[in-house]
Curated annotation (Swiss-Prot):
Protein name: NADH-quinone oxidoreductase subunit H
Pfam families: NADHdh
Stated role: NDH-1 shuttles electrons from NADH, via FMN and iron-sulfur (Fe-S) centers, to quinones in the respiratory chain. The immediate electron acceptor for the enzyme in this species is believed to be ubiquinone. Couples the redox reaction to proton translocation (for every two electrons transferred, four hydrogen ions are translocated across the cytoplasmic membrane), and thus conserves the redox energy in a proton gradient. This subunit may bind ubiquinone.
Protein source organism: Baumannia cicadellinicola subsp. Homalodisca coagulata
Regions that span the bilayer: 9-29, 78-98, 111-131, 156-176, 183-203, 234-254, 262-282, 296-316
Compartment annotation: Cell membrane
Origin: domain of life: Bacteria
Gene Ontology biological process terms in this record: aerobic respiration
Protein's membrane topology: Multi-pass membrane protein
Cellular component terms (Gene Ontology): plasma membrane
Highest classification ranks of the organism: Bacteria, Pseudomonadati, Pseudomonadota, Gammaproteobacteria, Candidatus Palibaumannia
Family: Belongs to the complex I subunit 1 family.
Gene label: nuoH
EC number: 7.1.1.-
């Protein structure tokens, strides 16, 4: 009985520490991205608040908390309020199944991959609800774009993961990490990695797949009517999705927490940070394509590539058995 209580207490502590850390990192990503973009573009970036801009997060937090939390009179108040909460929560919960080290995972799910895909699907509902409840044509158009893009690229995301799942013989993310002891999945699943990363960019609505929020066409898309902390939940949620996709990329294709000499959680942090920097570098380097070009890329290149990768993986597994 005492041992059972200890396990429950440990699980609660893990959950609180992990989720608070992810929220803090997601909030701090705004400053980190602006500083990196400034470095890439030979300018300073935010450097006025604190030493080297280190207190910029505090300034942004104070600003967003004291902004008027305004709800348009023509909006559906209940759905308008629920949408950012659903988006933020669904993206945050994905980290509960992420193995940060051999002994640090909040929830050990045998259907971890399916749980991730389910949470990614729920975030689409939040975007649609937010765009529709705003009763604004630009919000609705942005929400429809986001839903179509996310649902399309979720197909490629799921198919690209299936090759990894077939190799490991499990949907459990910890098992997938353990299966990469001798060789990382980036080698046998290179095309799966490419499509997964592209689909991850699209699902996060990150540049160059940020058409749902394009300022020139849709005046910031589905969250145009949001302000205050409601906008903050959408804003931080997008950065949490960036961290989540980066963490999932290294977990599925780059051995997760595995590495020599350093502690496992340090390897997890280093690898995740590298892919976050790559995400930001892509934003600094690439132009934004048209919306139809994004959809054509998905259905004419990503889909055949994922199907080919899955077919080759199945043939190799059958041959080896």
């Amino acid at each position: 009985m005492l041992h059972l209580r200890y396990e429950y207490l440990l699980a609660i502590v893990k959950a609180i520490v992990t989720l608070l850390s992810v929220v803090t990192i997601g909030a701090y990503m705004s400053f980190f991205e602006r500083r990196l973009l400034g470095l890439f573009q030979h300018r300073y970036g935010p450097n006025r608040v604190g030493w080297g801009g280190s207190l910029q997060l505090l300034a942004d937090t104070i600003k967003i908390l004291f902004k008027e939390d305004w709800i348009p009179p023509f909006a559906d108040r209940i759905i308008f309020t629920l949408a950012p909460i659903i988006a933020f929560t669904s993206l945050l919960l994905v980290f509960a199944i992420m193995p940060i080290s051999p002994n640090w995972v909040v929830i050990e799910l045998n259907i971890g991959i399916l749980f991730f895909l389910m949470m990614a699907g729920i975030s689409v509902y939040a975007i649609l609800l937010g765009g529709w409840s705003s009763n604004n044509k630009y919000s609705l158009l942005g929400a429809m774009r986001a839903a179509a893009q996310t649902l399309s690229y979720e197909v490629f995301l799921g198919l690209s993961i299936m090759g990894v799942v077939a190799q490991a013989g499990s949907f459990n993310i910890s098992t997938i990490v353990a299966d990469q002891t001798h060789i990382w999945n980036i080698v046998p699943q290179f095309f799966g990695f490419i499509t997964f990363y592209l689909a991850g960019l699209a699902i996060c609505h990150r540049h160059p797949f940020d058409q749902p929020e394009s300022e020139q066409e849709l005046a910031d898309g589905y969250h145009i009517e949001y302000s205050g902390m409601k906008f903050g939940l959408f804003f931080i949620g997008e950065y949490i999705s960036l961290v989540t996709i980066s963490a999932l990329t290294i977990t599925l294709f780059f051995g997760g927490w595995q590495g020599p000499w350093l502690p496992p959680y340090i390897w997890f942090i280093i690898k995740t940070t590298v892919f976050i920097i790559i995400f930001i570098l892509i934003r600094a380097a690439l132009p934004r394509p048209r919306y139809d070009q994004v959809m054509i890329l998905g259905w004419t290149i990503c889909l055949p590539l994922t199907l080919m990768n899955l077919l080759v993986t199945a043939i190799v597994i059958l041959y080896n058995t």
